[in-house]
Amino acid sequence: MTTETRDIVVVGGGTAGCFAAATAAQEGLDVALLERKSEDEGGHIACGDAIKGKSTFPDVIDRDYLREEAFTNENIQRALFLNPKGEDIDIPFGDASGAVVDRKRYGEVLLEEADRVGADVHYDTVVQDVTQNGQVTGVTATREGDRVEYDADVVVDAAGSLSLLQDKTDFEGTTFDTNVDYSQFCSAYREVIEVPEPVDYDDAIVFKPTAELGYLWYFPRSDRIINAGLGFQMNKPSFPLVDVLKDDLETRDEFEGATVKDKLGAALPTRRPYDSAVAPGYMAVGDAAGHVNPTTGGGIPGAAKAGHWAATVAGEAIADGDVGEDNLWEYNERVQRDFGKRFAAMDLFNIYGGAHSVDEMTDIVTALPGQMLIDLMGKKGSASLSLAGKLKTGVVTAVKTRGHWGTLYEAYQVNKLATRLKDVYDEYPTSPSGFEDWKADRDEIMDDVYAVTGADPKY
């Protein structure tokens, strides 16, 4: 077995891993990025491909190059909800336009950029274990058939959902969140499909409800290349994703005579971000730390930020000669006070939805005003359910939701709890010493959520 010694070892060459490696390299650290796939397959990851735009990315790579190479459709102006029970719902984005990318090329560019700025990218490297001695000290892996031990001051876990590294690491006595279960994840499958004629929704991301609180999507990379996929919550009975997608595509005229160019599946978190994603010598980022919007599955912007912040904080800790939890804690604080609080708030609506049937949720979504849906699914993480707003649209909404008033009132209560929850996340502790008290405050709100919705505890 050969041994390599680095400042930082990043495991996983997705969005979070590449931004962590690029950031570390830009700061002059000796960093190795371990990617299990071959160089040809690097960047080939199951994804819906929709993002908000290149401005969401930290400026540690050539963002213009990324845009030119991978952003195939920058004209996403609306979300279209295909309603099986009535009129489709068209929600404009206004100034917040989005984009759809070629995910394979996007991933290739990130790996290229990490290499260009100084990270050593090791392809065909499969990590099998974590080394520890009172703290995480590195990983062992097989690289192109040879055993390699990577020693590092900090290991950045960017290995994705249900990370193997977390199974191998002893977190006893640390703050690292181990309250993780498969039921907090979603199973997803997507195909990239070329259609014979241009579609009329190349300016939209299209959603459609499926069984078990999942959704089916059509995201246009162009007017003739569509990313079509679906997912379901793992805490619900499973259903055959491939067959369900196939059956749906067969009902849509635009897919007649279409060609499947690629297909891939994956698990992704549909839970709040990990309460703490650090342990001595160890940091988790991206899907490996639950950095995904639990209602939409969107995770690219959060992963990019998390990778960047983790490497920045790790570099400072290494310079101090102390990579304990106290010195890595600022990373937790940055995540939780930024997108973490919004994702945690959105998770309440996931819990609420899971306590009701898909049909009931569809009826309610159909009846709600469009702006309310924008607020719920957008940046705010809560809806504008003010008294004035309710009075303004109350008559129409009340008539449309007849028979579901109790469930709609639950949504109103959950929305208020989501606002309270974000306030708690704004007070995320500045050091591990306040962590237990903070969790107690947060868990009081979660108890209220379970009482209001009747849902089984998720955590």
Enumerate the language-model features and the residues they cover.
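Short beta-strand to alpha-helix junction loop
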Residues: 92-112, 233-241
